[in-house]
Amino acid sequence: KLLDIDKEKLPEIQKSYEIVGKVSAQAAAETGLSTNTVVITGGGDMFSMLYVSGLHRKGSAVDITGTGGVISGYTETPVMDKRIMNLHHVLDGWVPFGNIDAAGVSFRFLRDVLCKKERDEAREKGIDDYAYLCQIAEKIPAGSDGLYFLPYLMGERTMGSADSRGCYIGMSMDKEIGHFIRALLEGVAFEFKRTLDIFEEHGNDIQAVYHVGGGAKGDLWNQIKADIYEKPIYTLQTDEGGVLGVALMASYAVGLIDDLVAKAEEVVKIRKIYEPNQNNFGVYREMKDAFTELHDTLQKPFKHMARVQEKYR
């Protein structure tokens, strides 16, 4: 009504696991499928993946750290807060989420710009680039001796401005390359922690976080996130993506399985659990507060920087 859109021109809303028709004659001819093959509504790739990555019960969250990053919860109703976004889940309920456009890609940027020597050393030794960088970062204490990284290399969406930019803050003469690596891993986790806090501010208790994507491969980043989130981090044996989720919904639609939640419990196989280290809670809580203060304080300078750059581009 607000946008004056004729409702009759919009498709009927269906559940993701409902049958909406059968394969057309044309599609059957092009694919070889029978015209008796049913078609279900299905769901978006992210939400189909979330369903089989731990987001099948309330009280859980999923951290997807790939090139970009998304952290999502699962709630009965939308979390009405302008700092995050909400979309309907493929199951009954809603997925509130926040994102970082430059999550894993920040790590790649660091590797290729500031850590070329270390990257080349890793390759000479036959070690994965990122695993080698994490070995260096492991020698640095939690909190990176006061070095902060703001992971806004590609700006922000709802938590800030598209003009936001990546920053290292707290540099001093005692910092080594390991500080820069660890601070980056912590900075991404601090940003996601802000979103988790919003979920819980609205009464949604998060008991565990499932971690998937390339960022979930290394022990150090998983442990940093467990310590900053103050939640156990669950990594999975396999990462099937949305294809498995849609396959299960189709199976449910035709009666091959009778409980989508129970089936998710069956297929979500845990690889390793990272328990939070309470010894790091103090430093990370205070640093997260300082991180948020830095973020908020820099919004005005970020806009000024963007105006200057645009003027002299």
Report residues per predicted region.
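Active-site core segments that coordinate phosphate-bearing ligands/cofactors
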Residues: 1-4, 18-313
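Divalent-metal (Mg2+/Mn2+/Ca2+)-assisted nucleotide/phosphate chemistry catalytic cores
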Residues: 7
